[in-house]
A protein has these predicted regions:
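Bacterial N-terminal signal peptides that target proteins for export
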Residues: 1-9
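Extracellular glycan-targeting catalytic surfaces
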Residues: 20-214, 225, 294-297, 304-390
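Bacterial N-terminal signal peptides
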Residues: 8-16
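Hydrophobic alpha-helical membrane context
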Residues: 15-18, 242
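Long, repeat-rich segments with strong aromatic
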Residues: 233-329
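Short, contiguous, pocket-lining structural segments
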Residues: 163, 167, 171, 192-199, ...
Length: 390
């Protein structure tokens, strides 16, 4: 994990970056997050676990314990109503089965809030409540989820599941982070912690060896980035240093040079029907990879390819359009244009890594408690205390 920020109430960093004169960045993340974290955690103290076993879709080829979702942009063919679905890029089919995805997002929101509240207060009631949900998802035989995504983003008449569906479990990342936050508390027994980590280890093995996982790794756009982000997070939780090393090299040698242009943009995302949202999503995911994998001796935020592609360039490209979206020179997103931006994690992680006040200041001005379901789905980093305090 990124070790440069230690547990404390006030983060004060003195630096000299890229030849600039030494400056001081004073950033009280605990104070910024305190009210919203404790408010949200208070609500989640009353919530009972809901896992994949709480509902089943008859179109699923899996069992009650298998996560199931359907491809977003696939619709009935008007010319062949009973035939295979057809694709409409960027247009979400509202009749798709999304109950398992909603349950996982809810689990992520609960975990993030409770884990963050425990960091702030060390009150075991937050850890105890989180453990109830962890046991339901990963331990209890009647309610746990199988550690694979064989039936994610299925398409009627075409596929019972696809590698592209792996992106659905980006919402387990802050679950993993929350586990790390409470793992030394009295709420989680050694036996339960071992079982939970074994679940993540099994899922990590599936992600890195199954044909769906390999396909997602090699997809080439934001899906490859999110595959690496998940793999890095789960390897960090399970202390799989071999996989973490692989992810560092994958970021340096594949993701950054293959997806970022020399101006810091992401051409593969700009070609999509939602170029603004996808660009934000991708820079956030890359910054999150850097936040997990950076070490004192290998800081991915400072890494640059030989031709100058790096995270600073990527954030410099998108930041002006976060500040003023009306300047966006590309096509407007076909859906959810008005809902973006929100509190993009790349601004925080990059701002702290480079000690750049304009980014942390901008981050603070943006909405942290967004409610649009599509925005929530595409913002897996919601509770930054889990990420920057060890």
């Amino acid at each position: 994990m990124f070790k440069s920020i230690q547990i404390c109430i006030l983060l004060v960093i003195e630096i000299s970056f890229l030849g600039c004169s030494s400056t001081k960045l004073t950033f009280n993340l605990n104070k910024i997050e305190n009210t919203r974290v404790l408010r949200n955690a208070s609500f989640y103290l009353k919530e009972k676990p809901i896992t994949v076993t709480s509902s089943f879709c008859e179109r699923s080829a899996g069992t009650l314990h298998d996560f199931y979702s359907e491809g977003d942009y696939w619709w009935p063919d008007p010319a062949h109503p009973d035939g295979p679905y057809i694709r409409k890029d960027g247009m979400t089919n509202p009749d798709n089965f999304i109950v398992h995805r909603e349950a996982m997002i809810r689990f992520s929101q609960i975990s993030g809030a409770l884990g963050s509240a425990y960091i702030l207060t060390h009150d075991q009631k937050y850890a105890d409540q989180l453990v109830l949900h962890l046991k339901a998802w990963f331990i209890n035989e009647d309610t746990k989820m199988n550690p694979n995504l064989l039936y994610a983003q299925a398409i009627k008449g075409i596929a019972t599941g696809r590698g592209i569906g792996i992106i659905d479990t980006i919402h387990l990342i802050e679950v993993a982070k929350a586990i790390q936050a409470i793992q030394n508390s009295n709420a989680l027994s050694k036996s339960d912690l071992t079982t939970i980590k074994l679940w993540f280890s099994n899922y990590l093995n599936w992600l890195t060896t199954h044909e769906y996982g390999i396909a997602e790794r090699d997809n080439g756009n934001n899906h490859s980035v999110c595959w690496a982000l998940q793999v890095a997070a789960f390897a960090d939780l399970t202390n799989d240093t071999v996989v973490m090393d692989f992810c560092r090299n994958f970021f340096k040698n594949t993701l950054l040079p293959n997806q970022m242009a020399k101006d810091g943009s992401f051409p593969l995302e700009l070609k999509r029907t939602k170029p603004y949202g996808y660009s934000l999503f991708t820079i956030d995911a890359m910054a999150s990879i850097c936040q997990i994998l950076s070490t004192k001796d290998d800081n991915l935020f400072l890494y640059s390819t030989k031709d100058g592609r790096n995270m600073a360039l990527g954030l410099a490209f998108i930041a002006p359009y976060i500040t003023n979206k009306s300047l966006w020179p590309y096509t407007k997103d076909v859906m959810y244009w008005d809902e973006w931006p929100v509190r993009q994690s790349s601004l925080l992680f990059g701002g702290l890594a480079w000690h750049t006040k304009k980014y942390t200041d901008l981050w603070q001005t943006l909405n942290a408690d967004f409610t649009n379901p599509e925005v929530i789905r595409n913002m897996p980093v919601r509770y930054p205390l889990l990420w920057v305090i060890n």
